[in-house]
Amino acid sequence: MRAVLLVCLLAGLAHADLFTAIADLQHMLGAEKDVTTIIDQYIEAERARLDDLRRYAHEYVHRNAHAESVGPEFVTNPINAYLLIKRLTTEWKKVENIMLNNKASTFLKNITDNRVRSEVKFPGEEDLSGAATALLRLQDTYSLDTLDLSNGIIGGEKVSNKLSGHDTFEVGRSAYNQKDYYHCLMWMQVALVKIENENPPTIEEWEILEYLAYSLYQQGNVRRALSLTKRLAKIAPNHPRAKGNVKWYEDMLQGKDMVGDLPPIVNKRVEYDGIVERDAYEALCRGEIPPVEPKWKNKLRCYLKRDKPFLKLAPIKVEILRFDPLAVLFKNVIHDSEIEVIKELASPKLKRATVQNSKTGELEHATYRISKSAWLKGDLDPVIDRVNRRIEDFTNLNQATSEELQVANYGLGGHYDPHFDFARKEEKNAFKTLNTGNRIATVLFYMSQPERGGATVFNHLGTAVFPSKNDALFWYNLRRDGEGDLRTRHAACPVLLGVKWVSNKWIHEKGQEFTRPCGLEEEVQENFIGDLSPYANDP
């Protein structure tokens, strides 16, 4: 019966992937307000109300009022976003059970039908899991303390409400379900601390102990796992697995020293993603940037690009970020009004971003890329056409063979792990249908400026570029001889606080033969963008 009612309630409403774009989370704020209305209507219709149900109604009212007072920025905070999703998944199920006891299935069906007609999006279990995983990703990338993060403290600053013991437990359980015992151990420890100060506790101690004990065992802390399991058996004597687990751990420790204090907890982080430069990547995301080599330090500079007739009247500001390979930042090259048009055009088209499988050539979703994107044709709106022409002005590269403008909105902890923009030789059928060659260069427009996080980092080069609204980052993916430049492997760091909107243009080889010809010597690369050296004419 419960399963039938759940299907009735959420059919057509539960939308996975909401966590992959902050824009969707902002739209979801209205759904929480809808929950309050549902509960209030049910109370009036039945003329009776259980105390627990009324408590949930008051909590929803209070939380929604706070969220509305903050506005759309409410869900740009990862803790707030997680709690919002949790309230609309786990806690709503509790509300559903209370209604079920009152035989409210008919009432719920009417509400569900209304929601379907109004197209209100509700999160699903995948969204809750994705939100929890995002918190863990942010914790690792930015070296956040588990207790601080659970208390809404980031970088020593209180930025959100704190998590309850149950909230914290759910984050740990999400890690457990992914066999991530490193994070499960930390979050279950904090859950124990939380419930000590809760009256009544939001979750029972024995529920936490079982997950914590097994995670301790998996991380090599067998004696501690045994100690906690004995405690579990004592406070929950009817637990179906406790006594058996005690014997299992005792057998495992047979013949070993069981006397004395428990050894320190061992909790080594295990990497499952195969990213060998993980430490360097995360350090760059935190702004731990190595010093510039002395030979380049005095050469990095800004200049005015005016090597085209139009640019003589309206020169473009260029900041050289790095030589060999060259990377520059074009300053103020997209206007706020243009950004708003692009976001408005892209929002209805946003779909979860995909990556190309190097073996099959198929596009697929991946946990290492959390965002939603949309593609905008040049003839869709005059603004898109104008931006495309401007790209040609400041890159000097022919746009006839560039891809459509891709717009991306990063979700909760949104990121894109280290990758190449160009296709490597072993990749199957990459860009074959385009018949325009490889991606010679990338233009990345920053259309918003997150409060924290969201940098573009080049791991092997030790370069980190933090988003600056209205600017565009540019780099060449290929050497002048057409070979892929492996040094351009880069990543989009997780967004810690705020919203990240970007748009990018991938420019292809075909049509650039005379604009960027192969040099006489392989090692000779560009020192600036444009046909002529800008320095001689700079004021």
From Swiss-Prot:
Top EC category: oxidoreductase
Entry annotated with the keyword Endoplasmic reticulum: yes
Record: residues binding Fe cation: 419, 421, 490
Superkingdom of source: Eukaryota
Major localization listed first in the record, in broad terms: endoplasmic reticulum
Pfam families: 2OG-FeII_Oxy_3, P4Ha_N, TPR_P4H
Gene3D superfamilies: 6.10.140.1460, q2cbj1_9rhob like domain (2.60.120.620), Tetratricopeptide repeat domain (1.25.40.10)
CC cofactor: Fe(2+); L-ascorbate
SMART domains (alphabetical): P4Hc (SM00702)
Residues passing through the membrane, by range: none
Residues carrying a glycan: 110
Keyword Membrane annotated: no
Domain Fe2OG dioxygenase: 401-509
Catalytic activity field: L-prolyl-[collagen] + 2-oxoglutarate + O2 = trans-4-hydroxy-L-prolyl-[collagen] + succinate + CO2
GO terms for biological process, alphabetical: macromolecule modification
Localization per Swiss-Prot or TrEMBL: Endoplasmic reticulum lumen
SUPFAM superfamilies xref list: TPR-like
Enzyme nomenclature, EC number: 1.14.11.2
Annotated signal peptide: 1-16
Residues binding 2-oxoglutarate, per UniProt: 500
Subunit text: Heterotetramer of two alpha chains and two beta chains. Exist either as a phy-2(2)/pdi-2(2) tetramer or as a phy-1/phy-2/pdi-2(2) tetramer.
PANTHER family tied to this protein: PROLYL 4-HYDROXYLASE ALPHA SUBUNIT (PTHR10869), PROLYL 4-HYDROXYLASE SUBUNIT ALPHA-2 (PTHR10869:SF156)
Role summary: Catalyzes the post-translational formation of 4-hydroxyproline in -Xaa-Pro-Gly- sequences in collagens and other proteins.
Protein name: Prolyl 4-hydroxylase subunit alpha-2
Native source species: Caenorhabditis elegans
